[in-house]
């Protein structure tokens, strides 16, 4: 039996330690989306923040995955709005921080 495509998982663990997420599902012009706010709770700024949105069925199984880009850098203690189209309306969604880069204070360099 053929195996389906591999599922994405966050590239950096413990994103919930550094960021807060609030989201809800919606419809914009007849298209399904997930939108919300991400907050940076850590002492460094973050950029190139990407979110992983899992579309879930009634049993909690993943039916689709979407990568969403946060449109702004997140200085420490700030929040930013995000919005992402999803392939189709799902029973529920799971949103997690997929990847990001830290910005060192003052130099604009990223942390390894």
Task: Name these PLM-found stretches.
Residues 44-46, 90:
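A cross-taxa feature marking solvent-exposed loop/turn segments within ectodomains of secreted
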Residues 38-43:
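Asparagine-centered strand-capping/turn motif at beta-strand->loop junctions
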Residues 50-54:
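Beta-strand signatures of extracellular beta-sandwich domains
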Residues 16, 46-48, 58-68:
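Short beta-strand and strand-turn-strand segments in soluble, beta-rich domains
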Residues 57-58, 74:
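Short, acidic, Ser/Thr-enriched surface-loop or helix-capping motifs
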Residues 1-31, 104, 108-111:
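Transition segment at domain starts
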Residues 64-103:
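Short, solvent-exposed, Trp/other aromatic-anchored flexible loops in extracytoplasmic proteins
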